[in-house]
Amino acid sequence: MKNLVLIMLVTMMALSTEANLIENRSDSNDHRWIDLGLPSGTLWATMNVGASSPEDYGDYFAWGETSPKEVYSLSTYKWCKGAENTQTKYCSDSELGIVDNKKTLDPDDDAATINWGPSWSMPTEAQMQELITRCNWKASTMKGVKGYSVTGPNGATMFLPAALCRGDGPIDDIGWGGFYWSSESPGFIDASGGLTFGEAGASWAFLYRFGGCSVRPVRVLNK
């Protein structure tokens, strides 16, 4: 009987340790991440850039900008000169601006990297598609904030608040849905890709780059 009790205690301690490793990992700056058990090994942050808790909306960023601001519009966007056909970076079409054929954000233009450090980045399209297709999405509420609970293959869950996006005015219907920037753009349109969710669930979509949207960092640890 004593041996059985000892085995049970050891097992419970091991499970507790495993749970802590899944849910409570953090870097030296206390930026926390969660292991959802995804095939790629991608680890997702537990909160948005600029947030103080998982349900906090955090800051809003135009694509390729690293600081929040009050107005999100073509006239305030860093990588154009005030019009759709005046792109100065991340452009593959001469009719849209200066061609450089860049389709992935440089680290200096990555809001996750600049605000959280070099081990963090904005997710790629592949990482977002993996989150969409490999996880279970469920509309939920955390501390009164609407959003989605995303449960990975290993049963671990993270929360994405429905923060919508910002433009040149106040946000209407906040809590209805969300849009999270990726690090990638097709280059041939004045929009970039990201993860969107709402009443219809989660999907990959494009949005004008100058819009202010949420950023959820990712990292991949060496195995």
Model-derived features with residue positions:
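Single-residue recognition of alpha-helix boundary sites
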Residues: 13-14, 135
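Sec-dependent N-terminal signal peptides
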Residues: 4-13
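Sec/Tat signal peptide C-region and signal peptidase I cleavage site
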Residues: 15-19
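Conserved positions within compact, well-structured domain cores
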Residues: 21-223
